[in-house]
Amino acid sequence: MNHKVLLINGPNLNLLGRREPSVYGHQTLADIVALLSEQAQAAGVELEHIQSNAEFELINAIHATDAQMIIINPAAFTHTSVALRDALLGVDIPFFEVHLSNVHAREPFRHHSYLSDKAIGVICGFGAQGYEFALAAAIKRLKA
C-alpha cells in the first residue's frame, strides 16, 4: 500500500522566517517542507503540501486528498474555523495538529482550538521540530 500524508499550513505561515522570528523561528516554510519531504521519502511515504491564507482552499484540499493521514497547522484558523473542523470530520482522516509556538503560553484567545479535541495529538512549542515529531508519529501509525 502506498502511504500518503497531507501537510496543511494555514494563514501567514508563508511568512515564516521573517514574521516574528522570536516567536516562530528563522526557518522558512520551504525549509520546513524540504526537511519533511526528506523524512517522508526516507520512510517510503509520500508527502503532499498545501499552504493557503484562504480557508476555502484548505477545505478543498482536505476534501480532495487521498492521504491516509493529515498534519495541520491551522494557524489563526485554529481559533476561528468551525469549517476546517467540519471538513476534517467529514473526510474521517486521522490528523495531528501542530503549532510552532506554545499557544498556551500566549494570549488567552490563542488557548482555544476548534480542532484539538478531534486530533490524534497536538504538538506545540517545539518550533519547526514539531512538524518532524508529527510526521514521525504519522509514519509510525501508517506502518503499524
Swiss-Prot record:
Gene Ontology biological process terms in this record: amino acid biosynthetic process; aromatic amino acid family biosynthetic process; chorismate biosynthetic process; quinate catabolic process
Enzyme nomenclature, EC number: 4.2.1.10
Listed Pfam families: DHquinase_II (PF01220)
Reaction equation(s) it catalyzes: 3-dehydroquinate = 3-dehydroshikimate + H2O
Key words of the record: Amino-acid biosynthesis, Aromatic amino acid biosynthesis, Lyase
Positions marked as site (Transition state stabilizer): R19
Pathway: Metabolic intermediate biosynthesis; chorismate biosynthesis; chorismate from D-erythrose 4-phosphate and phosphoenolpyruvate: step 3/7
Subunit structure as annotated in this protein's UniProt entry: Homododecamer.
Catalytic residues, chain numbering: Y24 (proton acceptor), H99 (proton donor)
Name of the featured protein: 3-dehydroquinate dehydratase
PROSITE patterns in UniProt: DEHYDROQUINASE_II
GO molecular function: 3-dehydroquinate dehydratase activity
CDD domains the record matches: DHQase_II (cd00466)
